[in-house]
Amino acid sequence: MSLSRVSVTGVRNLHPVTLSPSPRINILYGANGSGKTSVLEAIHLLGIARSFRSSRLLPVIQYEQPSCTVFGQVDLAQGGHSNLGVSRDRQGEFQIRIDGQNARSAAQLAEILPLQLINPDSFRLLEGAPKIRRQFLDWGVFHVEPRFMSTWQRLQKALKQRNSWLRHGTLDAASQAAWDRELCLASDEIDEFRRAYIKALKPVFEKTLSELVELEGLTLSYYRGWDKEKELSTVLASSLNRDQQMGHTQAGPQRADLRLRLGAHNAADILSRGQQKLVVCALRIAQGHLVSQVRRGQCIYLVDDLPSELDDNHRRALCRLLEELRCQVFITCVDQEFLREGWQTDTPVALFHVEQGRITQTHDHRE
C-alpha cells in the first residue's frame, strides 16, 4: 500500500499543498526549520490521528487558522484505493473520515495506513519508560493478530473496574471476583499474542540488526508483567493488600516490558546514541517485515533527519534495508545529496524541496 496523494491545510508553517508522492522513496530536503518535519507530522496525523511532536493537537494548527486538515488517497495492495481525512479545529472538535464516512476511532485509520516513525527521539524506545516499549510491541501485535483489539478492550474494561474497586470498594465480593476472572482471561490472551509476536520478531530483528551493525551479545526478551511461573490470579490474590494501598493493580499486561541487554547490562546504558538508533531502526524494519508476511501490503516509513548520528556506511545500509522492504518511505534531510545516491537505479525516487513552508516537487535525475 502507498499514499498516492496527500493534501495538507493549516498544519504548522506549511502552505496549503497537494503532493503526489512516489510509491517508493520520497526525499524532502531543505534548511532546518523549513517545514520538512511538519510534512511527516501531517502524514502521521492522517494515519494515527496524533502528532509525534506534541501531546496536544492545538499547537499543530497554523497560527490564525481555524483548523488543520489532512486528506490522503491510499492505494491498497489488494487493488482499489481508500480515501482518508482528519480534521481538528481550535475548539477541540476532531473528525476522522474514511471513504466519506465518519470513523469510530483512530484504530480504523491505523489498520488502513500502518505507519512507522524513525526520528531523533527514536532512542527513547530503549532509554524511555516501559510504556513506550509496550506501545511498540502492541503496534506490532495489532497489525498481525485480528483478535488483539477486542481482547485489549476487554482487558482495559476489566482493569478499570478492578482499579476503581481497589480505590473505592464499590463492588460486592461476587462482582469483584467476576471482574478478576475476566481480567485474568483477557491478560492470558494478551500475553499469548505478545509472546507469539516476539517469537516471530526476534529472528527477523537479529538478521536485520546484523546487516546494520555488529553488536555481539545483544539479546531481546519479553517480560509479561508478572511472574512467569505463577498464574495471574495467584499473583493478584497475594498482592491484594498492597494493590489496595496503592489504588491500582500492580501485576498484569499493563506492566509488561521488552528488555534489550548487551551481556549483563541494559543495552541503553552501554550503546552510543548512534548504535541505539541503529537498534531501533532494526526493530522497526523487522516489524515491517512481519506486517508484509501477514497482510497484503507494507508499512509506510516516516524517517526524520536520517543523516544525524549515522555515518555514510550506516546510512547506506539503512537505505538498502528500507529499499528491500519495497515499501513507501518519506525521508527528510538538509542536503539531498546525503540520500539521493543511496538507491538502486530502478527504484522510483521523488524529491521535494521545502523552503519556508512551501513544498516544490523537483525532478530526480533518473526521470
Curated annotation (Swiss-Prot):
Residues holding ATP: 30-37
Subcellular location: Cytoplasm
Pfam families in the cross-refs: SMC_N
Keywords, in A-Z order: ATP-binding, Cytoplasm, DNA damage, DNA repair, DNA replication, DNA-binding, Nucleotide-binding, SOS response
Major subcellular site: cytoplasm
GO biological process: DNA replication; DNA synthesis involved in DNA repair; double-strand break repair; SOS response
Family: Belongs to the RecF family.
Name of the protein: DNA replication and repair protein RecF
